[in-house]
């Protein structure tokens, strides 16, 4: 047991950089010293106070940001439709809601998340006993790549929007930095989930690779046994043919060969009717090829190499298969616990991604029509910045959905690999073992969902893509209808004003005519 503990590398050892950044940002409340010294995530009262303080600070700064840049929002309702105003008001706070959901969930689960990674460490020890050594160095590289990509996307969106679309001549414009805090914190939180999910997928694949290795080893063992069996010597075309009564009709067709010539030619090497050499036994000059000069047949495959197979002994391999299935069940339970810990943050992220993707495209359309848009969505005024924002937002959602789907597929593939062991061994006892374990594996697969509302798989991604397209078309149609109604009202008001002016002018003409008639009548002397 001590040897397994020394050989197994803790998974949390690869989270050093991510933990320090998350701790400074106020995402995790766990104790810093215990993680640095023993790679453990344990509760911390000071960490909880620091996390709540940063949460309150972020909320206050975000509201100050909205108030400072809200001049455009206050004039938005008067200049645009109520639909655009309501959408902008709701989506202005959805990023803040997502950030609060991430931090409060981390605060609630601060004790359970440490237990989760401890269970993963115990799984690694059990896999090590079965010959599966997990290499966690790839996880460390993935974390660094994700952190670098996060910084690049956040800085690209923040700097480009600040330079092109914000009046940075005023000192209040520095508050625009606060607009990047919710998405940055959300991304750091989702890196924890994504990397942990990837670690589970690697362990499923390690079990599948072990079962596939058993199958390959047994196939090599069968080839080795087949190679040691006696193989009949190859036919030599230089020797005279032996008589076969079943081929008598063929002998008559090949030059009138009689039955007696076969026996004589076998003894003396000559005969009256001798079958001419076939084409592949002659060279290009029509000369017979010497049998001694031909290339000898290849030797049997690895006849001097001994291949042992665990599947050849059903009683011996039963314990290994049982252990692998138990580890598989434990990984599935860890996956369910992981999904439960991040269920609300995943739901908020998917809702945020769906709404922001649709709204960003809608506000891009509004910007092309020279309409006012909410202040925090001013990035939609620039198509290049819009592409970066959409790539960043959709990339997080799509990657988590894809990784969840691949992890679920890897868990279900274990049953296929297990059945291959039974098929290649062709042993009744092993068949019974495989069938018994397969019944257990039916309940071991894991599926990831967002609070049970929808499953994180490719079908959901396809449905979300169609929903974004449909709602975007509906919003554009509503916007067109609102603009047409506004233009109609303006036209009607202008016609009323014109009609009023015409009526006033007509009345003035009538008054002038009446006054002229009165003066004329009064001033004219009576005859």
From Swiss-Prot:
GO MF, any single term: ligand-gated monoatomic ion channel activity
Cysteine disulfide links: none
Parts forming coiled coils: none
One Gene Ontology cellular component: plasma membrane
Free-text tissue specificity from the UniProt record: Taste hairs in labial palps, labral and cibarial sense organs and forelegs. In larvae, is expressed in neurons of the terminal external chemosensory organ, as well as in the dorsal, ventral, and posterior pharyngeal sense organs.
The protein's name in its UniProt record: Gustatory receptor for bitter taste 66a
Membrane topology recorded in Swiss-Prot or TrEMBL: Multi-pass membrane protein
UniProt xrefs under InterPro entries: 7TM_chemorcpt
One Pfam family matching this protein: 7tm_7
Protein family membership: Belongs to the insect chemoreceptor superfamily. Gustatory receptor (GR) family. Gr66a subfamily.
Transmembrane segments: 47-67, 81-101, 145-165, 175-195, 346-366, 383-403, 461-481
Gene name for this UniProt entry: Gr66a
Organism field: Drosophila melanogaster
